[in-house]
Amino acid sequence: MARSGFRLAEASQKVFDAALLEAGARRDDVAYVIGTGYGRFQVPFRDVQVTDLTAAARGASFFFPGTRTVLDVGGQTMKATRLDDVGRVKSFRLNDKCAAGTGAFLEKTARYLGYATEDIGALAAVSHDPVPISGVCAVFAESEVINHLSLGASPADIMQGSIVSLVARSVQLLKRVQMEPEFTLVGGILRFPSMVSLIIEKLGGTVNVLHDDMPQYAAALGAAVLARRRGLSQAAPGREVRSGAAAVTVSV
């Protein structure tokens, strides 16, 4: 993974070269490359591109075949997706345009409190009395954070309150796709244990979560699954296929 900024093509080439080096492979060993994410059209060496919604759904169903509903919470969007019994997308909903329904909301809240994104999980973990953040706009949330601080609320309680707010929005989005178990949670924001715990508490039923930092790679892994299938279908007889996928992660 690499921070891309606006240099999406450069970032995609960088992570692709690094992946080849780590795998001990050459470019010619890769039969098919799929670009996904917001920068998918900027991946210069791709064979084709797919939406991150499709890729994340495929990644979720690959790891957890019983998945029927996927919640994908990333830095830019929140997506709820219903799948059929073979992992195809039946319906989906995205959050409203405002960043309050995305990881950017938590990043901005942390910044207002004087913390980095990497500190969010540890900060929220020591909260004792979460302070609700009622604002529906990540930009206007700054004034609400300042107000809570002036009233004596701790940064930890404000941070956890922001997570509670984000979880409430995610559950509402899931209801709009007529959610049903099994649920699978993906996206970079699912790195924060307190958010995962709250979502599991709200949903009930079977909730699947990839371990460690893997939730943020679900779309890339799903693209790899699609790439392998397409690479195998197009391979010449007798050729050994080592296929992969390219995914661009845009850091906000």
Where are these regions (language model features)?
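Adenine-nucleotide phosphate-binding core of ATP-dependent small-molecule kinases
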Residues: 141-174, 216
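Phosphate/pyrophosphate-binding loops at sites that engage ATP/ADP/AMP, CoA/4′-phosphopantetheine
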Residues: 16-31, 170-181
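Gly/Thr-rich phosphate-binding beta-strand-loop-beta motif of the actin/hexokinase/Hsp70
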Residues: 67-88
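Glycine-rich phosphate-binding/hydrolytic loop that grips phosphoryl groups
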Residues: 103-107, 211-247
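Short beta-strand-loop/turn "lid" adjacent to the catalytic site in phosphate-handling enzymes
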Residues: 1-4, 22-54, 81-82, 87-90
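Conserved phosphate-binding/catalytic loops in two-lobed NTP-binding clefts
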Residues: 52-53, 199-221
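Glycine-rich phosphate-binding loop plus the immediately following alpha-helix
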Residues: 4, 88-129, 225
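Glycine-rich phosphate-binding loops at beta-strand->alpha-helix junctions
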Residues: 38, 175-202, 214-217
